[in-house]
Amino acid sequence: MCIRDSLIVDRGDKREFCAGSIAKIFEEIGGKVIYFGKPYSPVYNLSAKISNKKVLCIGDNMNTDIKGANNQKFDNLLITSGIHKNELNIGSIDKLEEKYGVKVNYIQTKLKW
């Protein structure tokens, strides 16, 4: 079971392989992987059951976070300081959306609790 489909993740200044990379290799050698998490619908269905209010999906990955939100028709917030930071500059959100086949609703540089 793979609960994080992302291939890479940024941890501070370091870019590291994520669980999705291991799952992909396992599939390539014939293994069966069950995915749970973004962008797959079970995690979003669970979110919708928890609250009947509007859901906002927040993340930095176009392939998982934003794609999953789009698939479920939920609003999303792209954190631009994440894994796509080197692909982004002023006015490039449209190009990034086209490249990944997704639609971003809101953007923010960082998320701080």
Show the residue positions of the predicted features.
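Asp-based, Mg2+/Mn2+-dependent phosphohydrolase catalytic module
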Residues: R4-W113
